[in-house]
Each structure stands twice: as C-alpha cells, then as structure tokens.
Amino acid sequence: MRALWIVAVCLIGVEGSMIEFGKMIQEETEKNPITSYSLYGCHCGLGSKGKPKDATDRCCFVHSCCYAKLSDCSPKTNRYEYHRENGTIVCGSSTFCKKQICECDRAAAICFRENLKTYNKKYKVYLRFKCKGVPEKC
C-alpha cells in the first residue's frame, strides 16, 4: 500500500490545494481520492483528452475548466481553508483566488458524490490512449 501512495504522489502531486481537494472528495464520497479518481476516465488526474466517459469523468472535465479559468491563481498549489456547517462544505474567504479555487474543488467533490451510483470501476484506471473524440470546450 505504501508503494501505491508513493506512485500516486508522483502522478498527481500532493501539494497546495490538492490536499484540501483530496479531503473534500474523501468526506463527500467515502472513497480514497487517489485510488478512485486520480486515473479515472479521460479527464481525472493529469491531462484531459477526448470526450468524458460518464458523469464522474464529466465532473473532472468541469473541474479542469474551472481551474483553467483561475490559472493566474495557481489552483493546484495555492492552499485554502474550508470547514463544514451542518455537513455542507463552506469555503473560507481569505483571498479571491483561494475562495474561487475552493469553490471549484467543492463543486467537483459534490459532483462526485451525486454521481456515485454511476461510478464505473472499468474507468477507475483508464488508459488515456483509449480516449477518443474531439474534446469539448469549457
């Protein structure tokens, strides 16, 4: 299991907001964010290619688009704070960038939870060369 963690760290990097995003995913889905989502479909984890395979993969596509809109905010490395109120994720508001990054992650974590019933194990470790089609625009 330790080797899997080391590989996952190399693949997705555990820095900045990725730590908070991982916690959100774990809290919302009760799934391990690294083993369940880092290589899922065509849009989760590093790189984005082709059409989303299903609703969960679409969550990742939308999340990537959200981050793209915030590229000046360094969304993968800029850490933020959040808390929960009555089970709901509430993003802190220390700066505009941190709040917006948190909101992107919040929306994706909720999207994953809302699509748990259609999570497809065959896409859990999906090889990107299988991803075909013209990618949608954000």
From Swiss-Prot:
One of its GO terms (molecular function) is calcium ion binding. Gene3D superfamilies: Phospholipase A2 domain. Keywords: Acetylcholine receptor inhibiting toxin, Disulfide bond, Neurotoxin, Postsynaptic neurotoxin, Secreted, Signal, Toxin. The keyword Signal applies. Pfam families: Phospholip_A2_1. Expressed by the venom gland. It is found in: Secreted. Residues 1-16 form the signal peptide. InterPro entries: PLipase_A2 (IPR001211), PLipase_A2_Asp_AS (IPR033112), PLipase_A2_dom (IPR016090), PLipase_A2_dom_sf (IPR036444), PLipase_A2_His_AS (IPR033113). Residues 121-133 are annotated as: Important for membrane-damaging activities in eukaryotes and bacteria. GO terms for cellular component: extracellular region. Disulfide bonds join C42-C131, C44-C60, C59-C111, C65-C138, C66-C104, C73-C97, C91-C102. Snake venom phospholipase A2 homolog that lacks enzymatic activity. Is able to suppress the acetylcholine (ACh)-evoked current mediated by alpha-7 (CHRNA7)-similar nAChRs in L.stagnalis neurons (IC(50)=2.18 uM). This activity is only partially reversible and seems to be non-competitive. Belongs to the phospholipase A2 family. Group II subfamily. S49 sub-subfamily. This is Basic phospholipase A2 homolog Vur-S49. It comes from Vipera renardi (Steppe viper).
